[in-house]
Regions:
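Structural motif
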Residues: 53-55, 95-98, 123-127, 171, ...
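Active-site diphosphate/adenylate-binding microenvironment
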Residues: 8-12, 17-77
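Active-site-proximal loop->helix
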Residues: 112-116, 136-150
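Conserved small/polar residues in nucleotide/adenosyl-binding loops
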Residues: 193-198
Length: 198
């Protein structure tokens, strides 16, 4: 059997989404951005919205998504992606408009824009990548860093008496009357290692 005999549509288990280009990903090992990029591309293709999708990405690691997905992109100032998405959606209501934001952007400087866009019930999708740390700038504590989690700026772990509690953005968003849908997902793989040693 040749390679051509095997690689046929009816034999394929996986196929890279056509919206994903061949640029090598620059993300750190173990980072979930690439997995989320693939999921976004698959959903846009399934919806048949390739020509009508507009993504907004601000700063941090999230901004580089435009290097990997071949759709229309607009960069936003730090924390302002929901405001820009609102403007684009109001100008072009037939577009699939979404933001792609990290925790430093959405849960820190962009908290106001996020909360107000949700509370107004803007017809946009916000994809929030929460890795609980400022990954691009050296591993500093983020607004979502977990209690006890060690970072370069909290080497003994997040202490609620010094740093307060982590913001639970999905919980906050779910309580706003304008929010249509909130879900929290994990895109990491958990491996269980066992030892056969007696």
């Amino acid at each position: 059997m040749t390679k051509e005999d095997i690689i046929k549509p009816e034999n394929l288990v996986y196929k890279k989404p056509t919206l994903m280009n061949d640029n090598p990903m620059h993300y750190c090992p173990g980072c979930s951005h690439g997995v989320v990029h693939k999921l976004i591309a698959e959903v846009i293709e399934e919806m048949g919205m390739e020509d009508k999708a507009v993504g907004i990405s601000p700063v941090g690691c999230a901004v580089f998504i435009y290097n990997y997905l071949d759709i229309d992109w607009q960069e936003a100032a730090h924390g302002r992606a929901p405001a820009l998405a609102t403007a684009i959606k109001r100008l072009w209501p037939d577009r699939l408009v979404f933001t792609y934001q990290g925790d430093g952007d959405l849960a820190c400087i962009g908290t106001a824009e996020t909360i107000h866009a949700l509370n107004r019930g803007e017809n946009i999708t916000i994809i929030f990548i929460n890795n609980a740390i400022y990954g691009m700038t050296g591993g500093q504590m983020a607004p979502t860093t977990l209690v006890g989690m060690k970072t370069s700026t909290s080497p003994y772990g997040r202490d609620v008496h010094l740093h307060g509690y982590p913001l639970k953005m999905a919980d906050i968003a779910a309580q706003l009357e304008g929010t249509a849908y909130v879900t929290r997902q994990s895109v990491q793989t958990c491996l269980l290692y066992t030892s056969d040693a007696a």
